[in-house]
Amino acid sequence: MWSGWWLWPLVAVCTADFFRDEAERIMRDSPVIDGHNDLPWQLLDMFNNRLQDERANLTTLAGTHTNIPKLRAGFVGGQFWSVYTPCDTQNKDAVRRTLEQMDVVHRMCRMYPETFLYVTSSAGIRQAFREGKVASLIGVEGGHSIDSSLGVLRALYQLGMRYLTLTHSCNTPWADNWLVDTGDSEPQSQGLSPFGQRVVKELNRLGVLIDLAHVSVATMKATLQLSRAPVIFSHSSAYSVCASRRNVPDDVLRLVKQTDSLVMVNFYNNYISCTNKANLSQVADHLDHIKEVAGARAVGFGGDFDGVPRVPEGLEDVSKYPDLIAELLRRNWTEAEVKGALADNLLRVFEAVEQASNLTQAPEEEPIPLDQLGGSCRTHYGYSSGASSLHRHWGLLLASLAPLVLCLSLL
């Protein structure tokens, strides 16, 4: 009975090759749409956005998780490029920095037209698939990029923003971030302020995906209950597998299922294993858990490549996606489930967001109250009349009367 023992390693190798071959076969027909990649930030950090610097050539770019050969090897067919500006730009130059990073994405697509197709719709993604190009979309990572302005939000939409992450790792005046749940930030909005609710409604009206990565649990729940369309978590994993507050807890996963929304799993080691080291199999554990709790329709990929310092063994860069798909097939995921995670789930959610939009509806116009705006370097134009300025004028009046009150008290 042991006469064939020497064949076992060969059988294992052949089985591994089978799953890898199957992964490539599936991905040729259904390439992956990744929800979050920070290559634009690397282009700023390494080259100050000088894309014509010979070192910035994306066909030979070194030292990053992402370049054109790696995208091709990984069967990446769609990418939300992250337009990110750090939290320390809030109330300073966040809007300018955001515009510059959007410009980088546009220029990158124009410089490599044989590889990238800039798109703003689900139909555009499908067109890129047909042309064998990487559908390139813009996701703005952090609500501080709109500077608490509905007008800025609409302008960013016109420039191509197709998802907005409501916060990064800092509160905005209208939404709370995930550090509230760790105790490292104080809650300001109890999820969403009234102005934050208007932001959600305006994103729905425009047909912009709402991204709940980085937000507090209260903000997750408030948005899932308010939004008229499904939402995404562009780069978040499962809290029950790794208890990082950047991940999505099971009660929220159940809301994701109820709203037909989407969790695109982040590959950062500390959100996968809760340690500095992780591996591909542990990423698959997160995908399994989300599928179990929220359903196969709720699963996607948001690797956070080039935005994190540590990625799992076996997922060293964007070229490794076929190995992750092979692992899911090894775990008895069906071809339909795999295709859903690769692209179909994101396309379904995006199409639902587009269908829920209503550009003929009047836009949200009520600005944020002046006393809720942060930062000292602001003018008050437009607040000189109406309720918002009334509180300010009363405050100035009371301040001017303070010396008189003090004098009277001394009489």
Swiss-Prot record:
Q: Which residues are glycosylated?
A: 57, 279, 332, 358
What are the EC numbers? 3.4.13.19, 3.5.2.6
Q: Where, by residue number, does Zn(2+) 1 bind? A: 36, 38, 141
Per the UniProt entry, the effect of residue 141 to C is: Complete loss of activity
Q: Where is the lipid attached (GPI-anchor amidated serine)?
A: 385
Source organism superkingdom: Eukaryota
**Entry protein name:** Dipeptidase 1
The root-end lineage is: Eukaryota, Metazoa, Chordata, Craniata, Vertebrata
- Gene this protein is translated from: DPEP1
